[in-house]
Amino acid sequence: MTKRNEAKYKIDRRMGQNIWGRPKSPVNKREYGPGQHGQRRKGKLSDFGTQLRAKQKLKGYYANISERQFYAIYVEATRLKGDSGENLIGLLERRLDTVVYRAKFVPTMFAARQFINHGHVKVNGRRVNIPSYKLKVGDAIEVKDASKQLALVLEANQLAERDVPDFIDADHNKQTAKFVRIPHLADVPFAVQMEPHLIVEFYSR
């Protein structure tokens, strides 16, 4: 198992959930945390513990976004009109790495970040190598020509474990996608329950 996979699956083990719905997740076989004390029965979490866990799970899902970056997204969410929890999800789903993953150009969130860093992705015809780049409705995303036949891309296109959500219009023949609309929480195909309202409560303490 690569170091990248070890880090990814460590998140699953720590949460005790298969947060991406991957067939090879270790929690499909055992539902306890990593380490020698992982099998101990966990007591009931406090409100703070529940809120913290919700934050860790959402951060982990989006390829372990740093606390600094995640908090900045939260602050932006609170400044937008409407429900802050919904806004938080909308902003996370507008990230280029998220959309590259949702469009099934790569197999994992972690791979999306690396794929973009290595210059394989264009937005509106221009190469973008910033995973956190914030997309607008109508933006066109494309795998650059030299990368369209990479095994990583072709294998991701065929993944049966997840579908492209309807807020992204993907064409795997051309390896292009369009960001159609900003999704609500209910639109996002999370494999496990996410609770952004608890994250709002956590930061509002």
UniProtKB/Swiss-Prot annotation:
One MF term in the entry's GO annotations: rRNA binding
GO cellular component: small ribosomal subunit
UniProt keyword list: Ribonucleoprotein, Ribosomal protein, RNA-binding, rRNA-binding
The keyword Zinc belongs to this UniProt entry's keyword annotation: no
SMART domains (alphabetical): Ribosomal_S4, S4
Residue intervals of the S4 RNA-binding domain: 94-157
Chain residue ranges for the region called Disordered: 18-49
Single GO biological process annotation from the record: ribosomal small subunit biogenesis
Listed Gene3D superfamilies: Ribosomal Protein S4 Delta 41, Chain A, domain 1, RNA-binding S4 domain
Domain of life, per lineage: Bacteria
Family to which this protein belongs: Belongs to the universal ribosomal protein uS4 family.
Function of the protein: One of the primary rRNA binding proteins, it binds directly to 16S rRNA where it nucleates assembly of the body of the 30S subunit. With S5 and S12 plays an important role in translational accuracy.
Self-association and partners: Part of the 30S ribosomal subunit. Contacts protein S5. The interaction surface between S4 and S5 is involved in control of translational fidelity.
Name recorded for this polypeptide: Small ribosomal subunit protein uS4
Source organism of this protein record: Nitrobacter hamburgensis (strain DSM 10229 / NCIMB 13809 / X14)
Gene name as annotated: rpsD
